[in-house]
């Protein structure tokens, strides 16, 4: 005669396993805007309608940092983040990345940060920039601030005081510059950032809005930094490798751009060399990676598999919901960048996705509070998890 307690134990075990299986199929996506939340809901509905395995829920975060906290605490599972946010998520919250965006279908390179100079400037070197003039797209931007200033710190050309006052160190180093936004209250609450960081700025046609962190300053942005060098107001401009080509050969109809030829400009390399504009792959300050989906380490596998199924269904959709289109959401790059061709699986850690050149740059700013020096990363058992992921459904 069977013992009734044995049957009860089996039933309870089955219920527990079913509950665990159901929970494991739920992906809670952390969104930070109304547009992201709506696209997340649309993705969830379309995935359900197509019987895609896994259940997507949309949760709201106040900011990328809030999403990091929610993912760490287990109230969310995934969120797409920029490269600098990925570094913070990994270093401070012990998180990792499951997939990354690819804009060419092959790798996760977003752009190269390069140093542009006029070809006629024969005595320039990135290793000897003291008292030179510089043009930056904007304050606290990856291209215009983080990468070039990180490079100068890492090459011991500038040193920062105990208060980690980077603007003062940069102002003491360069003769004069244009760093739009450096005097804004957001970046200069005490009003004592060096004035020479605005001396290469020109404002608008009426000499107003000088050093403004917007297009009213004509040297704002990457095109503005290029113009700054083209008009001989700066020795070097820090821009993306595509900036020159985006503004020449008739693509920019402003007079300064129409008068500029490719032969008028060159690249300055980190080792002191020079190169032509087409040699950015071997002459750059940093390679900035694309966005990636941040997750807990133990969820790399299941989030990747869910996104792989979603990608197969909606990445190349010509009608209805499209994973890499934001045309219906009132702004570009919602959830994923519109230029994404494919989501790539990240086999290594978040550090491998970010790459050595970019992470080395970011480490130069750790004392500034970009990353909390007290936080520690979680142990990385990614090789074991990737092995398990390959051999499970």
Predicted features, each with a name:
Residues 2-76, 81-84, 100-110, 127, ...:
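N-terminal hydrophobic or amphipathic helices and topogenic motifs
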Residues 39, 68, 88-90, 123-126, ...:
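Extracytoplasmic/secreted cell-surface and envelope-processing proteins
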Residues 72-81, 133, 231-239:
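Alpha-to-beta junction loops
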